[in-house]
């Protein structure tokens, strides 16, 4: 355990301007990111993550193009921060060490190197170079529900051995419950050094984002991810203003202005949501099936294009154990479902 909720301060990491990109198809304007970053900075958030939803260099036909480049978003946020640490996310194979160096030159001082939960070995080069640049580095094990706690802990151990100063349980599918979160951090404790920090990245697809984050902190996770109004993929992340209000009632040290976060969520972020970020039929299907949360908007488009129920697509993606990076398979799955339905109609008496 690297954190004691009774005496230590939580490290609040906002992901509104990175994970939140998924919720609006990476369409934040420069004025939006400036205003949101300024509000977060003034509210006392420790770190603010900025990038395309799929991390540095994520803009592509597969993942979706953004309204601006990573560099334009990062420069805009760097201009307004006075205390919060400018952070970004990099997925090896999407982002390269060249993007990492460029982000550092723009003022990024902390990076999360993200891999699928069974592929920590591909993070070695990027973690090492980030450490050489003097950056704060976290390992980010996505879709952490897909493997058993002990196996996840061994992947975390690899990231620690490469130089990660913190390793996350990353519930990308919003499929973990409190018992699953607890078991994973207990497994981390059995193999990681006490000085290696733990972090929690929750999604709200089963309405457990805040509860899971509280349990994570009770199990020693000092770094907690959250976003204003839950702005994130699927049903969103743990809503920042809700999480902070909940832990404030418990007397925990979070360092944030609760009312300022409420105002930012309501006035700056919620009006941007062209699709409400909430638990509904489709986002609940994500958590129920254990599907990567950023598949939501892609699956909804495929459902509209081919006259299907988005839930059918999401459940099938779960059956096939599709993971982040396989967005191109969503249309294939939709076509398979459509062909099966047409075949059944053709043989019906």
From Swiss-Prot:
EC identifiers of the protein: 4.1.3.39
Matching InterPro entries: 2-IPM_HCS-like, 4OH_2_O-val_aldolase, Aldolase_TIM, DmpG_comm, DRE_TIM_HOA, PYR_CT
Residue positions of the active site: 22 (proton acceptor)
Keywords from the UniProt entry: Aromatic hydrocarbons catabolism, Lyase, Manganese, Metal-binding
Disulfide bonds: none
Residues annotated for Mn(2+) binding in this entry: 19, 201, 203
Domain Pyruvate carboxyltransferase: 10-262
Gene3D superfamilies (alphabetical): 1.10.8.60, Aldolase class I (3.20.20.70)
UniProt xrefs under PROSITE patterns: PYR_CT (PS50991)
Gene Ontology biological-process annotations: catabolic process; L-leucine biosynthetic process
Pfam families: DmpG_comm, HMGL-like
Binding site for substrate: 18-19, 172, 201, 292
GO molecular function: 2-isopropylmalate synthase activity; 4-hydroxy-2-oxovalerate aldolase activity; manganese ion binding
Reactions mediated catalytically: (S)-4-hydroxy-2-oxopentanoate = acetaldehyde + pyruvate
Residues marked Transition state stabilizer (site): 18
The keyword Manganese is annotated on this UniProt entry: yes
Family indicated by similarity: Belongs to the 4-hydroxy-2-oxovalerate aldolase family.
HAMAP family from the UniProt entry: HOA
NCBIfam families membership: 4OH_2_O_val_ald, PRK08195.1
Descriptive protein name: 4-hydroxy-2-oxovalerate aldolase 1
Organism field: Rhizorhabdus wittichii (strain DSM 6014 / CCUG 31198 / JCM 15750 / NBRC 105917 / EY 4224 / RW1) (Sphingomonas wittichii)
